């Protein structure tokens, strides 16, 4: 039986799509003599580059089916297949085969949100996130960035990954927020008291990533997680020597510096891990997906490879930690949570891309919230990115703004009393969009449980 071929006229590389629906698995194609995936002829200049070795292995899994186009936010908005996963795959393919990349190549790769929705959709298991990271790094080595971009990136790299630098700026902004133009003031959350952090008292201990911007912008998130887990018999321990997870530098093509940050975090946490810490918690799903990738990022490091792999395996998102500990919650306190949840009103939940696509935890947080008695509204296209995507909203404001508007409209369509999410970037980005039309608070979902344990209603100022 021969595969049916359809030409993909919108893509500029003369690709033929082969729809292999008669095969039980895409991988079975090779058994029928059909070459599986994108075939490459690596240029001699890249023959010893480990990044290109990984790129080639990933490319071989892609069967050109085009299913990723249907779930790619930038392709949906722009309609250009070069701004789709398949289009970017073939641009990267051309680069590793020796074709000189251009400014246009860089622009199409930059427009990728790295939301990894395509990975969830892909039937072949293409690890597109690793592919785009390596592809961008290769292209940037050969295409010069503009001065304005370099200045903006330099400022972000100087500030964002360092909480000792970002916190004073945030406090200053909060102090003068009232006299700022509204469009700027909306981007600065109101200062709030995070509340007490329970003293470690349980045999079960879990480490927590403080992060870089979260202590300054949403300090209540980790404090709320500490109180909820304390009620469930788990002590949350912060190790001050640990810093940024490395995601900011890694995705801004400063991979070597990012790897150093990963090593520093491993060194900071390792004594506690050896003492029996049961896991590492990342309340921001964007940080969590980076921590879970330490094993891959440091796989070739002879000193840190094993430690990085173990740390990745120990890393938990908030929902994984709470779900595993919830059975230890006292029945009376559980009843208090359910009573508060029933009175909370409808909740709209936005699952961050890093949670549902990066960590493959789609639907898990929603299931936990429903189990505790919360009513969740229906949100159309919940699989799509809100447009935050780390620093994407800074470098691609037009696309980011359109995605933000679409997401806010979808979240508000069910008239929720509160909007919840699981990542600081999404929380702030959606909060800025919501603030333009309503006063619905946007919070991390763990704050709902924290308030419910205290017998309080949902809502409040934490999302601003």
Task: Write out the residue ranges for each language-model feature.
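Cysteine-centered iron-sulfur cluster-binding motifs in ferredoxin-type domains/subunits
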Residues: 56-75, 102, 106-126, 354, ...
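Acidic, Ala/Val/Gly-enriched low-complexity intrinsically disordered segments
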Residues: 7, 28-30
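Short hydrophobic transmembrane-like helices used for membrane targeting/insertion
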Residues: 1-4, 15
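Iron-sulfur cluster-binding electron-transfer modules in prokaryotic oxidoreductases
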Residues: 128-464
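Non-heme iron-sulfur electron-transfer modules
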Residues: 35-47, 51, 75-107, 125-154, ...
């Amino acid at each position: 039986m021969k595969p049916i071929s359809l030409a993909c006229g919108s893509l500029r590389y003369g690709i033929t799509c082969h729809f292999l629906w008669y095969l039980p698995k895409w991988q079975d194609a090779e058994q029928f003599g059909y070459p599986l995936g994108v075939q490459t002829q690596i240029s001699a200049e890249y023959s010893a580059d480990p990044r290109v070795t990984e790129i080639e292995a990933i490319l071989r899994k892609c069967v050109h089916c085009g299913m990723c186009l249907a779930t790619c936010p930038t392709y949906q908005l722009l309609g250009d297949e070069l701004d789709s996963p398949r289009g970017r795959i073939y641009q990267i393919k051309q680069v590793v085969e020796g074709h000189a990349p251009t400014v246009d190549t860089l622009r199409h790769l930059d427009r990728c949100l790295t939301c990894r929705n395509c990975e969830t959709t892909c039937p072949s298991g293409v690890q597109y996130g690793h592919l785009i990271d390596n592809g961008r790094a290769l292209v940037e080595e050969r295409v010069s960035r503009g001065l304005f971009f370099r200045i903006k990136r330099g400022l972000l790299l100087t500030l964002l990954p360092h909480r000792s630098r970002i916190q004073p700026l945030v406090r200053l902004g909060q102090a003068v927020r009232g006299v700022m133009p509204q469009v700027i003031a909306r981007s600065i959350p109101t200062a709030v008291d995070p509340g007490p952090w329970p003293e470690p008292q349980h045999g079960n201990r879990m480490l927590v990533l403080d992060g870089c911007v979260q202590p300054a912008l949403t300090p209540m998130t980790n404090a709320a997680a500490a109180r909820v887990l304390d009620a469930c018999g788990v002590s949350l321990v912060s190790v001050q020597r640990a810093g940024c997870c490395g995601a900011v530098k890694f995705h801004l093509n400063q991979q070597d510096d990012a790897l150093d940050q990963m090593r520093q975090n491993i060194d900071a946490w390792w004594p506690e891990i050896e003492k029996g810490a049961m896991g590492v918690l990342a309340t921001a799903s964007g940080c969590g997906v980076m921590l879970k990738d330490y094993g891959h990022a440091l796989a070739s490091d002879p000193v840190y490879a094993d430690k990085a792999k173990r740390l990745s395996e120990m890393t938990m998102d908030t929902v994984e930690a709470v779900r595993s500990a919830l059975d230890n919650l006292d029945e009376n306190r559980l009843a208090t949570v359910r009573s508060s949840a029933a009175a909370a009103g409808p909740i709209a939940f936005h699952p961050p891309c890093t949670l549902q696509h990066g960590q493959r935890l789609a639907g898990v947080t929603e299931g936990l919230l429903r189990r505790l008695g919360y009513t969740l509204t229906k949100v159309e296209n919940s699989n799509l990115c809100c447009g935050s995507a780390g620093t994407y909203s800074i470098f691609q404001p037009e696309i980011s703004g359109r995605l933000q508007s679409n997401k806010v409209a979808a979240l508000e369509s069910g008239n929720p009393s509160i909007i919840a999410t699981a990542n600081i970037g999404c929380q702030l980005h959606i909060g800025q969009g919501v603030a333009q039309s309503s006063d619905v608070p946007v919070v991390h979902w763990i704050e709902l449980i924290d308030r419910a344990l205290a017998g309080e209603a949902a809502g409040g100022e934490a999302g601003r």
